[in-house]
Design a protein with these regions (language model features):
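Rossmann-fold NAD(P) dinucleotide-binding segment
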Residues: 51-113
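NAD(P)+-binding Rossmann beta1-loop-alpha1 motif at the extreme N-terminus of oxidoreductases
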Residues: 1-62, 123
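Rossmann-fold dinucleotide-binding core
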Residues: 4, 9, 94-148
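Acidic, glycine-centered active-site loop in nucleotide-sugar glycosyltransferases
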Residues: 42-44, 77, 84-86, 127-130
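Active-site-adjacent beta-strand anchor residues
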Residues: 30, 64, 93, 135-136
Length: 148
């Protein structure tokens, strides 16, 4: 299975990261909340100290953050510099279209591939692993994101 960097372990991200770990992925999980990190550890994820540490060496980097400003900030300050050139960036946050496009452009400027992949289904579906993803990006980016 793959190494996955997961950034944002709140109500939705915590369940999503746990399900990736259950599927056998090596999940490096980051959140500002110590409680969220402990829940991730209990679910089989490896808690890390920074977003950059979550991104380092990951085949896929998934963000699930509260707002577009958070996504832009974590990409600019951590993800884009730490990501492997071959990594797929998957933002599952519910953010506005303009921000999603800016984030994708930021990734492309660094030679990285990104998809916008907000979800539907709520906390119960995140915990059950039954979320519906609405993915925007190139066909190649979609193909690379699909296993995650």
């Amino acid at each position: 299975m793959a190494r996955v960097g997961f950034i944002g372990l709140g109500n939705m991200g915590g369940g999503m990261a746990a399900n990736l770990a259950k599927k056998g992925h090596d999940v490096r999980a980051f959140d500002l909340s110590a409680e969220a990190l402990e829940r991730a550890r209990a679910a089989g994820c490896l808690p890390v100290v920074t977003a950059a540490e979550a991104a380092e060496g990951a085949e896929a980097i998934i963000t699930m953050l509260p707002a577009g400003t958070h996504v832009e900030q974590v990409y600019a300050q951590s993800v884009l510099d730490a990501a492997l050139p071959s990594a797929i960036l998957i933002d599952c946050s519910t953010i506005d279209v303009a921000t999603a496009k800016r984030v994708a452009e930021m990734a492309a400027a660094k030679g990285l591939v990104a998809v916008d992949a907000p979800v539907s289904g709520g906390i119960a579906a995140a915990n059950a692993g039954t979320l519906t993803f609405m993915v925007g990006g190139s066909k190649d980016a979609f193909r690379r994101a699909e296993p995650f």
